[in-house]
From Swiss-Prot:
Disulfide bonds: none annotated. Belongs to the UPF0301 (AlgH) family. It comes from Xanthomonas oryzae pv. oryzae (strain KACC10331 / KXO85). The lineage of its organism: Bacteria, Pseudomonadati, Pseudomonadota, Gammaproteobacteria, Lysobacterales. InterPro entries: AlgH-like. It comes from the Bacteria. Pfam families: DUF179. GO terms for cellular component: cytosol. This is UPF0301 protein XOO1425. PANTHER family: UNCHARACTERIZED PROTEIN YQGE (PTHR30327), UPF0301 PROTEIN YQGE (PTHR30327:SF1).
Amino acid sequence: MSVLPTPLANQLLIALPALSDPTFSRSVALICQHDENGAMGVLVNRPSEYTLGEVLSQMGIDTDDEPLREQIVLSGGPVHPERGFVIHDDAREWDSSLEVGQGVFLTTSRDILEAMAAGNGPRNVLVALGCAGWGAGQLEFELGENSWLTAPSDANVLFATALEDRWQTAAGRIGVDLFRLTDYSGHA
């Protein structure tokens, strides 16, 4: 029987420079669930081609809040790209919500979007279409292959850092400069 390392929920998964898969290259994912069956996360630094206004309109939700309508929706990953995932810091009871950890929540129900459209939503929020998933042992294998770094989740990285800066900023929080890393080793 293998022992699962410390679960990675509420950790940021930071792609190392050698990770060349275009979906995950230079990505940062918030790990939302992690257990012996696998892991689920949402990429938090990949813009999609959609604005929140377009998504709300497709769902029949109206809002006059122009900054909300212009908010970029993230591409959260290749799994369930038709589903919405809302990462936020609002502990209210939503229809389908999970506490990722330390005041960070993942909600997948329509009620949070309706509250946002009405001006009653979370103060800090990321909306994504799709998520990332890893089968049993897959993420642990990828970590062992040096594809990823992990760092504690950080509200500043999630909600206050520009999308294009999240990759380097997340790594910098643990003292790593990703531009100084190489993907090969030398021998003496």
